[in-house]
Swiss-Prot record:
Keywords: Cytoplasm, Jasmonic acid signaling pathway, Metal-binding, Nucleus, Transferase, Ubl conjugation pathway, Zinc, Zinc-finger. One of its GO terms (molecular function) is ubiquitin-protein transferase activity. Induction: Induced by the mycotoxin fumonisin B1. The gene is RGLG3. CDD domains: vWA_copine_like. This is E3 ubiquitin-protein ligase RGLG3. One of its GO terms (cellular component) is nucleus. The keyword Zinc-finger applies. Its main location: cytoplasm. It catalyses: S-ubiquitinyl-[E2 ubiquitin-conjugating enzyme]-L-cysteine + [acceptor protein]-L-lysine = [E2 ubiquitin-conjugating enzyme]-L-cysteine + N(6)-ubiquitinyl-[acceptor protein]-L-lysine. It is found in: Cytoplasm; Nucleus. Interacts with UBC30, GRXS17 and GLB3. Binds to and coactivates GAF1/IDD2 and ENY/IDD1.
């Protein structure tokens, strides 16, 4: 790796200087930070299916329902906090750890590496793609860090904040000798060190049951960096405290962002010229094929909605109500607005074909 030799010791620890979120926001502004340029990386490794045993009522951490899952909560809190500093409101969002990326690549939430248009779109897109992903592994944060480095280079070395939300630490198999790093640990550490040559802060948000002991060591013990560019935050621990929701959200945002003013100031003294590391940066993959198929199905539905809904009112027998979209299958899925379709059509639409209200609840109907 092409790293500077002038830093033989780990960077000085940046202490917890703030006691409130307002102080963090004020310090961000005083440091001259005007744009947060947020980047999101989401962990889709298979361990998400069981690491919510204690912290998320035995459900998958990616379970989609009426209430937000831990990933949705973390995205929302971070997004709301950093939105005052975001100029274009565009958020590059990446997934990693599924069967298409494993520990080597990332996929973009949208085709052609398109960014999400604001926080609400990022959460909405997350909810759209999750049901169509196949979780896998192992866990490495190197690909998403490398993707963030590429974004910084493509944006004239402007300051960015990469927020990685994950359910576990970097994969380390039991057969790795004591004192040695696993391939995933080595790649992640190399990427963090390479990222320290760029105006890029990395915040790792831990959701689920953990464990997180290795990530705590990563926070303070990575050597040979130009500045202390990595911060780990235990989302589960903070959100499980006995406080009201608003205070817990503020505490989490504070823990995640408290080092950014000092990190931003540290980046001002960087050379700000692209530095190529020895490991290869891969271009983000498109969303997995199942997500593309879902998108294509949704795009085809609106062209049929008006005509098929009108036909269903005229043609559907009263004794066997049929779906107003396909005019074939029986109605066996109801929405919160009270209207019904078949389950095949109901799972791919986001608004009711009759009243156009957003679909927030889907209920299977049985005869």
């Amino acid at each position: 790796m092409n790293m500077s030799n002038k830093r033989n010791q780990q960077p000085s620890y940046i202490a917890d200087h703030f006691s409130s979120l307002d102080q963090v926001i004020t310090s961000l502004r005083e440091a001259g930070l005007e744009s947060s340029n947020l980047i999101l990386g989401i962990d889709f490794t298979k361990s998400n299916e069981w690491t919510g045993r204690y912290s998320f009522n035995r459900k998958s951490l990616h379970a989609i329902g009426k209430r937000q899952n831990p990933y949705e909560k973390a995205i929302s809190i971070i997004g709301r906090t950093l939105s005052p500093f975001d100029e274009d409101d565009l958020i590059p969002c990446f997934g990693f750890g599924d069967v298409t990326t494993r520990d080597q690549y990332v996929f973009s939430f949208y085709p052609e590496n398109k960014s999400c248009d604001g926080l609400e779109n990022a959460v909405k897109r997350y909810r759209e793609i999750v049901p169509h992903l196949k979780l896998s592994g192992p866990t490495s944060f190197a690909p998403v860090i490398d993707a963030a480095i590429n974004i910084v280079e493509q944006n004239n070395m402007q300051y960015h904040v990469l927020v990685i939300i994950a359910d576990g630490q970097v994969t380390r198999n039991p057969d790795v000798p004591l004192g040695r790093l696993s391939p995933q640990e080595e790649a992640t550490m190399n990427s963090i060190m390479a990222a320290s040559h760029y105006p890029l802060s990395i915040v790792l948000v831990g959701v689920g049951d953990g464990p997180w002991d290795t990530m705590k060591q990563f926070d303070d013990n990575i050597p040979h960096r130009e500045f202390d560019n990595f911060q780990f935050v235990n989302f589960t621990k903070i959100m499980s405290e006995h406080k009201d929701a608003a205070k817990k959200e503020a505490a989490f945002a504070l823990a995640a962002l408290m080092e950014i003013p000092f990190q931003y100031k540290a980046t001002l003294s960087l050379n700000r010229k692209p530095v190529r590391s020895s490991h290869q940066h891969h271009k983000p993959l498109p969303p997995p094929p199942e997500v593309i198929e879902r998108d294509n199905a949704v795009r085809s539905v609106p062209n049929q909605m008006t005509e098929t809904a009108e036909k269903s009112d005229r043609l559907a027998p009263s004794t066997v109500p049929v779906c107003p979209i396909c005019l074939t299958n029986p109605k066996d899925m109801a929405f919160s607005c009270g209207h019904t379709t078949c389950k095949e059509c109901g799972v791919v639409i986001t608004t009711c074909p009759l009243c156009r209200q957003p679909i927030t609840t889907r209920i299977r109907l049985y005869t």
